[in-house]
Amino acid sequence: MTVNSEIARRVRDLDADSTETAEDAQHALTAMGPDVLDDVIAAVPGMGRFGQLCAIEIFTALGDPRAADILISLLNSESDTVRQWAAEALGELAVERAVPALARAYEAFRQRGESPDHSEGEGIRWALTRLGARRVVLPPRSAALRVSSGDEAYPLWPMVHLSEIVEDLAAHSQAVLYFQIWQIGTDGRRFWHGASDVDWDLDRSWTWDRNVAHCRDWALLAAEAVDTAPGLVASISWIGATDL
């Protein structure tokens, strides 16, 4: 079998009924390197949801900007997961020209009335932040208490400071959506440790100040009930008024 025919076979397998077959194809194509990109890009429009997700992972892993146009087109997918992953890939690949399309995708997300903590909204906001098109309000005190995460768009804080950070963000008119708890391994990688059992929502019929206070109070209640052992850190998701 020639290399070209092997690439073609693996690309077809990305859209296989079996997710195991599709994932095997994804890993094989990634291992083949940039030579597979043109074939994968050409096949993406005809793929189903899972095949497109596998393709997005290939594009991200290879880090090749040739995938930019197809990723931008996927921001219009009927699948919210495909839209989210495409947005995140554009951020990962530092595709600055995708900013207008990402802004339109986020406006469409807002117009649908989705909860701001929905994963699609999170992904698009992260991409816009990564590309310098969204300003995150991070108060000086909160910034000073951060621990290094390797990603300025994804800060982490020691759990012992969680309540203080929630208060600080609210004092600067930021609404805390949720937080998650992580364990940092000896190699610097983070491992999910848990999340709060308390959920809360914003209400678009309320004033922004009322939403901020509501989120602060629930986040503080949630913070009281979680593990604050040494070595644990928190990631916090928050938004400003223009994000709602």
Model-derived features: where do they sit?
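Eukaryotic acidic, Ser/Thr-rich intrinsically disordered low-complexity regions
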Residues: 117-136
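Amphipathic alpha-helical scaffolding segments comprising HEAT/armadillo-like alpha-solenoid repeats
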Residues: 2-13, 34-45, 64-76, 95-111, ...
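Amphipathic alpha-helical interaction modules
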Residues: 32-35, 53-54, 84, 152-201
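Residue-level detector of extended alpha-helical repeat arrays and alpha-solenoid scaffolds
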Residues: 21-22, 52, 83, 114-117, ...
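Conserved hydrophobic register position within alpha-solenoid helical repeats
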Residues: 25-28, 55, 86, 121-124
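Amphipathic alpha-helical binding modules
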Residues: 215-244
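Short inter-helical turns and helix N-cap capping residues of alpha-solenoid HEAT/ARM repeat scaffolds
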Residues: 17-18, 47-48, 78-79, 109-110, ...
